[in-house]
């Protein structure tokens, strides 16, 4: 079932390369293993990863595309990503599901925003000079370059923050 769903939703390599030619901003959402403490405990209200992705889609406007990347080695995730998981993702118009074999750092370097619940993808992003948005209680959420989602966060408020160039000095001092 998992493999069939992947086949139906995965973006082809050719289409993946075309995404970066579009005149849209790219937000990467890196999926977690399931089950995992990073989502089940630290994710708080966002222990449902699709809910976090749906919230991200509502937060960003139509200038954005969302790339959802499967964890590179989901040993048991296939048991927890059933039909409903993929059906909900398919309902998000600006979303593309990408192959787990793409290197995360290469996508981070091309993306405008990295989003995760609490994962190391956010930490990797700010270390590479990219802004990140976390939905759970990530250990790095107070560090410069990272924004923690809350219900009061609006696109206008968030876009102002995103438009400020990343300041490596502030990151090093935080």
Per-segment meaning from a language model:
Residues 1-83:
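Conserved catalytic-core segment of nucleotide-activated headgroup transferases in glycan assembly
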Residues 34, 73, 121, 139-140, ...:
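Short, glycine-/Ser/Thr-/acidic-enriched flexible segments
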Residues 145-174:
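Leloir-type glycosyltransferase catalytic cores
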Residues 21, 90, 108-109:
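A short, aliphatic-rich alpha-helical micro-motif
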Residues 100-147:
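A donor-sugar binding/catalytic signature common to diverse glycosyltransferases
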């Amino acid at each position: 079932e998992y493999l069939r769903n992947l086949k139906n939703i995965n973006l082809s390599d050719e289409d993946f390369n075309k995404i970066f030619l579009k005149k849209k901003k790219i937000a990467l959402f890196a999926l977690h293993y399931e089950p995992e403490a990073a989502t089940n405990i630290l994710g708080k209200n966002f222990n449902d990863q699709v809910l976090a992705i749906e919230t991200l889609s509502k937060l960003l406007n139509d200038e954005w595309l969302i790339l959802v990347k499967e964890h590179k080695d989901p040993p048991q995730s296939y048991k927890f990503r059933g039909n409903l998981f993929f059906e909900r993702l398919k309902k998000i118009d600006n979303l593309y599901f990408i192959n787990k074999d793409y290197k995360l750092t290469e996508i981070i370097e091309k993306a405008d925003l990295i989003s995760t619940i609490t994962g190391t993808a956010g930490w990797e992003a700010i270390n590479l000079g990219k802004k990140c948005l976390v939905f759970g209680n990530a250990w790095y959420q107070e560090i410069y370059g990272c924004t923690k989602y809350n219900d009061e966060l609006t696109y206008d408020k968030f876009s102002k923050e995103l438009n400020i160039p990343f300041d490596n000095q502030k990151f090093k001092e935080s």
